[in-house]
Amino acid sequence: METSNLISYDDVIDAAYDIFLEMASESLEPVDVILFTAQFDDRGAAEAVETRDDWSSHVGFDVDKELYAEVRIGLVNEENDQLDDVFARMLISRDPDHKFCHILWKRD
């Protein structure tokens, strides 16, 4: 597939955030939902990161890093500006003809 036909990373982030918001209340602990909601305006982030190699063990197929993007959603540490409280790691297809999303939720 030509990379020009792939969904942009910005659109992938937007889709990931929409999916996260829709599923968070059912998938996270109530305290994490409250924490995320209360602090998102000041510290919240959704960002595309380098797709890690462990996804194949979670989804059962080899992940093409051109066709799939990893998005992390969580809270940024104000001291070092790092997204270190991750509520969800998401693998999303960038192929508009092959919709796919897999989420690894935060577990305490």
Curated annotation (Swiss-Prot):
Official protein name in the record: Putative double-stranded DNA mimic protein PBPRA1522
Family: Belongs to the putative dsDNA mimic protein family.
NCBIfam families: PRK05094.1
SUPFAM superfamilies in the record: Putative dsDNA mimic
Pfam families in UniProt: DUF440 (PF04269)
Originating organism: Photobacterium profundum (strain SS9)
InterPro entries: dsDNA_mimic_put, Put_dsDNA_mimic_sf
Role according to the record: May act as a double-stranded DNA (dsDNA) mimic. Probably regulates the activity of a dsDNA-binding protein.
